């Protein structure tokens, strides 16, 4: 199993704070039943980071956060 590192994700979302927000929101979506965009048997937080590192999810997650 390949390990996901913050550096892998920072290549896609350079700002650490935006990365955390995007990963958190995506993990919440996954835990509520949304379909994963990659094949994964991991917990929602790890799956969200894997999606970001793979380029399947990005800053568009922040535009979906309700005000």
UniProtKB/Swiss-Prot annotation:
Keywords: DNA-directed RNA polymerase, Nucleotidyltransferase, Transcription, Transferase. InterPro entries: DNA-dir_RNA_pol_omega (IPR003716), Pol_omega/Rpo6/RPB6 (IPR006110), RPB6/omega-like_sf (IPR036161). One of its GO terms (biological process) is DNA-templated transcription. Its EC number is 2.7.7.6. It catalyses: RNA(n) + a ribonucleoside 5'-triphosphate = RNA(n+1) + diphosphate. It is an enzyme of class 2 (transferase). One of its GO terms (cellular component) is DNA-directed RNA polymerase complex. The RNAP catalytic core consists of 2 alpha, 1 beta, 1 beta' and 1 omega subunit. When a sigma factor is associated with the core the holoenzyme is formed, which can initiate transcription. This is DNA-directed RNA polymerase subunit omega. Disulfide bonds: none annotated. Promotes RNA polymerase assembly. Latches the N- and C-terminal regions of the beta' subunit thereby facilitating its interaction with the beta and alpha subunits. It comes from Polaromonas naphthalenivorans (strain CJ2). GO terms for molecular function: DNA binding; DNA-directed RNA polymerase activity. PANTHER family: DNA-DIRECTED RNA POLYMERASE SUBUNIT OMEGA. Belongs to the RNA polymerase subunit omega family.
């Amino acid at each position: 199993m390949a390990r996901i590192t913050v550096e892998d994700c920072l290549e896609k979302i350079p700002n650490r704070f935006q990365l955390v927000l995007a990963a958190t929101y995506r993990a919440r979506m996954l835990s509520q039943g949304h379909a994963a965009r990659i094949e994964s048997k991991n917990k929602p937080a790890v799956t969200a980071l894997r999606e970001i590192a793979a380029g399947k999810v990005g800053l568009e997650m922040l535009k979906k956060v309700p005000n």
